[in-house]
Curated annotation (Swiss-Prot):
UniProt-annotated binding residues for substrate 2: S339, G340, T341, T342, D395, G396, A397, D398, K408, G409, G410, G411, K435
Induction profile: By elevated hydrostatic pressure.
Protein name: Bifunctional ribokinase/ribose-5-phosphate isomerase A
CDD domains (alphabetical): ribokinase, RPI_A
Length: 540
């Protein structure tokens, strides 16, 4: 069990639920006013750590008022050590006035109160708690000198320090030098470094700024894109977990507190800890409010287990679709082998059938990875340049809509996949149930570009309202396709005309291919205990 000290703010949240934010001079009526909910970044992070099983002590400063009594009662209920809570008669307990719109996004105005009265002397009076901790977490809703004092004590005694630089402000070099781990969100990172957070390249540039100031690990939360971590030797973007957004209040605090409860001091389990924290945040945003929305360890582990069960079921459905498709393949043909995890199931299934039934089937691959797998299995492979056409290609898809239009390219093989698909007399796609959707809007579309013209395409996409991002490998190098090109990801807009988008992209100098596969799939096979097949010829 991690022993965590949180030095930070406590606020009582006054929450307004609004349809939209008022313009200057505008008066709007509201239907809901939630009064006296516990909040404050320090308190939220402490509660998140405690509910995730950490031995948590909270050093905070409260007024001598009813709000303080309510907050302390809540701290006790969560099993936190409150021996180091400080009370003052000079200031009221801090308050936060929060508006939440119908999409769940929030704006927050903070009255510091007793929080802003915390001094280095206050912190020093509770140094024994810090000395005996594994790590100390602090934010910027208390005066910076108090944070510096806490971190000085920690560093003198080998205690790890985590700084959540929120709200963002210019920080003294002294504080940065005392910080082991820093956890800004994307706007806070940009404020501190002057580098806008747009993609993994800019995230890494932000991280290097902090590395140069002695910080050992940087974690940037990037909202719907997930969270990014970097050390001098490693970095990765951890995806978010899909959830219906009700209220984003306390999501970042939940992430930090739950992460701190799970992260080993040597940082060896960073990916696992961040996945845990991402699940915790996904639960938080589904509930209105701050501290009442912070999940327990049991709730987080339950959703993680459900996610693992879902992944297991998805793999089962992939294998079922692949096995069904393998039974449909006729003898004496040239067969196109798709790319990706679902196609790999098919390659193994058709190879088994070729061996069992002594079929005369020759194959072409749509990626180097598929070719290596097929050759390892001893399948008869052809060079695509030596044939005029392919009789049948079986491939997976990233997503398929009800008109059998799809997106491919998540596996970085979209050019070869499209070339073989165009050569094929028939194309069968195999997917699990999660890949079949009403619309391609909102999904990631991959665009393959030549390295020389990549930035020109990137600028075109940005100027036309997309948010393009280059694809990178885990080690930070730009991802190259089997043909040596780069990949750019965009999100398909809600109102996109797919045909027009396809044509417009192909017109751009530097674009080699894109991942929209329109009117290509002849038959879709969806895995499951009851296989579902959809043929283009049956569509109305």
């Amino acid at each position: 069990m991690k022993k965590i000290i949180v030095v930070g703010s406590t606020n009582v949240d006054k929450v307004l639920n609004v349809e939209k934010y008022a313009l200057p001079g505008e008066t709007l009526a509201i239907n809901t006013y939630q009064q006296s909910h516990g909040g404050g970044k320090g308190a939220n992070q402490a509660i998140a750590a405690a509910r995730s099983g950490a031995d948590t002590t909270f050093i905070t400063k409260l007024g001598n008022d009813e709000d303080a009594k309510m907050m302390v009662k809540g701290f006790k209920a969560d099993g936190m050590n409150i021996d180091d809570v400080i009370t003052t008669t000079d200031q009221e307990t801090g308050k936060a006035y929060i508006t939440v719109d119908k999409s769940g996004q929030n704006s927050i105005y903070v009255y510091g109160g007793a929080n802003m009265a915390m001094t280095p002397t206050d912190v020093d009076a509770h140094k024994s708690a810090i000395i005996n901790a594994d790590r100390v977490i602090a934010q910027l809703e208390i005066p910076v000198p108090a944070v510096i004092e806490a971190f000085k004590i920690a560093k003198e005694h080998g205690v790890q320090t985590i700084l959540n630089p929120a709200p963002a402000k210019e920080l003294p070099e002294e504080l940065l030098k005392l910080t082991d781990i820093i956890t800004p969100n994307e706007s806070e990172a940009a404020t501190l470094t002057g580098i806008e957070v747009k993609d993994e390249t800019s995230m890494l540039a932000n991280a290097k700024f902090f590395f140069e100031r002695g910080i050992k690990m940087v974690i940037i939360t990037v909202g719907g894109r997930g969270s990014f971590f970097a050390t001098p030797d490693d970095h990765a973007l951890i995806p978010p977990f899909p959830a219906k957004v009700v209220d984003t209040t306390a999501a970042g605090d939940t992430f930090i507190g739950s992460l701190a409860s799970q992260l080993e001091i040597d940082l060896s389990n960073i990916r696992k800890a961040m996945l845990y924290a991402s699940h915790a945040s996904s639960l938080t945003i589904q509930v209105a409010g701050a501290q009442n929305s912070i999940p327990t360890r049991e709730a987080i582990l339950n959703v993680i287990n459900q996610d693992q069960m879902t992944k297991t079921e998805i793999e089962k459905q992939k294998a079922q679709a692949a096995a069904y498709a393998a039974k449909l393949v006729p003898d004496h043909i040239v067969l196109g082998l798709g790319s990706g995890t679902t196609a790999a199931y098919f390659v193994k299934a058709i190879n088994q059938r070729i061996n069992d039934e002594h079929l005369d089937i020759q194959c072409v691959a749509t990626s180097v990875g598929t070719e290596k797998l097929a050759e390892k299995l001893g399948m008869r492979m052809l060079d695509v340049n030596t044939i005029d056409q392919v009789d049948l290609t079986v491939d997976g898809a990233d997503v398929v809509d009800h008109q059998l239009n799809g997106i491919k390219g998540g596996g970085a093989a979209l050019l070869f996949e499209k070339l073989v698909a165009d050569m094929s007399k028939q194309n069968i796609w195999i997917v699990d149930q999660s890949k079949y959707t009403d619309s391609l809007a909102g999904h990631i579309l991959t665009i393959e570009v030549i390295p020389f013209g990549g930035m020109g395409v990137f600028r075109y996409l940005k100027e036309n309202g997309y948010q393009p991002e280059f694809r990178f490998k885990d080690n930070g190098d730009i991802l190259e396709t089997d043909s040596g090109n780069y990949l750019i990801n965009i999100i398909i807009p809600k109102d996109a005309d797919l045909e027009k988008l396809s044509i417009d992209l192909k017109k751009q100098t530097g674009v080699v291919e894109h991942g929209l596969f329109l009117n290509v799939c002849d038959e879709l096979i969806i895995g499951g205990d009851q296989i579902k097949t959809i043929k283009r010829s049956d569509l109305s």
